[in-house]
Amino acid sequence: MRQPRHWACGVYRRPLLALLAVLLLLPIASSAAPGGGTVLSPPKPLTGIDLIDQHGARLTASTLAGQWTVLFFGFTQCPDVCPTTLARLAGVQRRLPEALRPKVRFMLVSVDPMRDTPERLAQYVGRFGQDFVGATAPLGQLAPLLAELGVSYAYTAQPTGEHAAHAGHGMPAYTVTHSETLYVLDPQARLYAVFTDPKDDYALLRDLSTWASSP
């Protein structure tokens, strides 16, 4: 299995030990075709899904059930990896066979809930697709899901003068470091596969098409 990739929108470079622990503790983990994600067998049930989407609706495992879900963790002020990854996911969505598109949900989960309000998430994810989902939750509520998935993130203070738009709002300037892993949940909202390389569009498209075609 390839070493998980990292992206620093700041200066953070800590390895994703938590993600590796999630994979290693599962009874069986088998790689998909070369270049694809790591498929978990059996899928891992998730108990920490408790989010608020861009419309203010609560998202839990029961509300996510019924579709395949591709999760990416980031934040709306990420300068490059987040918009690049979401643009790639939008391309994957467009290339899915039309009959399969309703079976696959693409979701950005913000690890910056202090700034990423539902309104801001709605504006942001709407740039990539009308049916893209943006969600977050207060950190205490978000933490169980991050821990279950082994999501790596950290806040880094920025030098005075950067992001001056926040001046006067009582919010210190900071950026967020986060991993760029993609997590695929099955229609029972269980962790089904992990893609450590979000740039491998072909593998993601191939695997999603196969999985969503299954009865």
PLM segments and residue spans:
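Bacterial N-terminal signal peptides that target proteins for export
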Residues: 3-17
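Bacterial N-terminal signal peptides
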Residues: 15-27
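Short active-site neighborhood of thiol/selenol oxidoreductases, capturing the structured segment around
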Residues: 62-85, 89
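Thiol-/selenol-based redox modules, centered on thioredoxin-like
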Residues: 159-215
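A short beta-strand-turn-helix
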Residues: 49-69
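Structural microenvironment flanking redox-active thiols in thiol-disulfide oxidoreductases
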Residues: 84-145
